[in-house]
């Protein structure tokens, strides 16, 4: 575990000793997080980049480095103890998904059921954040 021992990950400044795992579609995430957390002396550009978030999370589970996670994607692994949240600081994301459909489609029962379901998932994720 990266958290244990005298060289473990105890505070955000310790990240300078660890590989940062980046998600290619969010190249600035580490810089934004470090700045928001007030962390100095950590080069946000270093580390390994992955095309898919789940690959970065798997690398973190394998002990290859530290990744920034999005709650809906990492929650099962946090609950199972495969991942841990090393710091109390959390940063909300401006990232969003949009459900789009033609106006008349909402009259279709399946479309309305899907919309209601996806909105309920979003509300649960917002409460967990």
Spans of features found by a protein language model:
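Hydrophobic hinge/microswitch elements
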Residues: 42-85, 92
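Alpha-helix/helix-capping structural signal
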Residues: 1, 25-28, 54, 72-73
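Secondary-structure junction motif
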Residues: 19-37
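Flexible hinge/capping segments at coil-to-helix
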Residues: 1-20, 36
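Residues at the C-termini of beta-strands that transition into short coil/loop
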Residues: 24, 51, 87-90, 103
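C-terminal effector-binding regulatory domain of bacterial HTH transcription factors
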Residues: 71-80, 90-129
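Short helix-loop capping/hinge motifs at secondary-structure junctions, enriched
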Residues: 2-10, 41, 104-109
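Alpha-helical segments flanking ligand/cofactor-binding loops in enzyme cores
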Residues: 13, 57-58, 112
């Amino acid at each position: 575990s990266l958290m244990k021992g005298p060289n473990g990950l105890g505070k955000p400044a310790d990240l300078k000793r660890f590989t940062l795992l980046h998600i290619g579609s969010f190249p600035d995430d580490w810089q934004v997080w470090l700045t928001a957390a007030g962390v100095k002396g950590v080069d946000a550009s270093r580390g390994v980049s992955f095309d898919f978030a789940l690959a970065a999370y798997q690398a973190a589970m394998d002990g290859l480095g530290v990744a920034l996670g999005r709650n809906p994607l990492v929650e099962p692994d946090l609950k199972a103890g495969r991942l841990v949240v090393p710091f109390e600081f959390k940063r909300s994301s401006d990232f969003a998904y949009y459900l789009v459909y033609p106006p008349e489609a909402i009259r279709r029962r399946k479309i309305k059921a899907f919309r209601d379901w996806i909105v309920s998932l979003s509300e649960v994720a917002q409460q967990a954040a």
